[in-house]
Amino acid sequence: MKAFKTRIYPNAEQTVLIEKTFGCCRFVYNNGLECKIDAYKKDKTNLSAYDLIKRITTLKKEFEWLKEVELHTLQQSILDLEKAYKNFFREHKGFPKFKKKGDKDSFRTFNMRFVSRHFIYLPKIGAVKIAEKIKKKWSIHNATISKRAGKYFISLLIDYESPKVQKTGEVVGIDLGIKTFATLSDGTKYENPKTLSKYEDKIARYQRQLSRTQKGSNNRKKVKEKLARLHLKVSNIRQDYLHKMSREIANRYSFVAIEDLNIAGMVKNHNLAKSISDCSWGEFVRMLEYKCSWYGCELRKIGRFEPSSKLCSNCGYKMNEIPLNIRKWTCPNCGTHHDRDVNAAINILNIAQEK
């Protein structure tokens, strides 16, 4: 399956209905979270998703406006809450929080259909114009409507048959870095676009303007929208670069080796946190994983504690320490001259192939 995301253009009436759906889903989610917390405090009872879904009928009688939203969409809010609880207990993620208006507004629907190549029908909302042409042969599992920086988007989960790509049998190791985003074992280098740093001054200017506005004022709302649009622009530029790079690698190679980095631990270094976050290594690896599966490429990760930078890829000699500012070095054992990043990428490939 594949997710296809594009912008939609609801009319004024549809915009109101979408905003109502956001609000109703948020209400049901928060009500379910409150019920689960209260039940556990009272007698250690853990209300199931089934228990909370049954309560939706009662809520509809008490709050008539909930009837304006499709039942399946409201039920999905409860399933999202259940997933958040499971993530908390099983994967040690943060405890579920109450949702606020404007905080990643979204909802999921299932009973949609294509009206034409430019319109998609959404239950209780109608036929909404879509930015990109749709292939009618697509089999859609669900659709997620979201809002960001005042713009509306739809993400369709569709059945996807991976294209058959003629592979050459090439193998490659990848070393991720800050100055150079990715260095491949064959010497190919992808520079870090440093997307955030290019817009940092403008972001800071908007943030200063925001701090000087009064809460609840129209000026504050306008500045917040400008800031949100700028953050969206930065995100889109970064995503586009990562998509192109990951697709190129997955398309070209038959075997890819990469280091399993502890990104959460690395961002604790306050000197490098902003640069690491701007790189979005985790997002790149995520993209590479699913694209490798599409294009018939094997992806293998090596342990984060492997000494990939300290080993001579020619003779295996291990250096005691190589400071970060040293970008090129010569092996004292065999005399091979190394580019630090290329050498690390070769070692990552060698270690992965030995497994």
Q: Which residues are covered by each model-predicted region?
A:
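Gly/serine-rich nucleotide phosphate-binding loop at the start of the catalytic core
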Residues: 1-74
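Positively charged, helix-rich recognition surfaces that bind polyanionic ligands
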Residues: 3-5, 136, 147-355
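A generic secondary-structure signal for well-formed alpha-helical elements
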Residues: 29-36, 85, 89-92, 210, ...
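Short, glycine- and charge-enriched coil/turn segments that flank and shape catalytic ligand pockets
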Residues: 39-54, 91, 164-168, 212-220
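An alpha-helix initiation/capping motif
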Residues: 46, 50, 72-75, 79, ...
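Acidic carboxylate diad motif detector
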Residues: 50-148
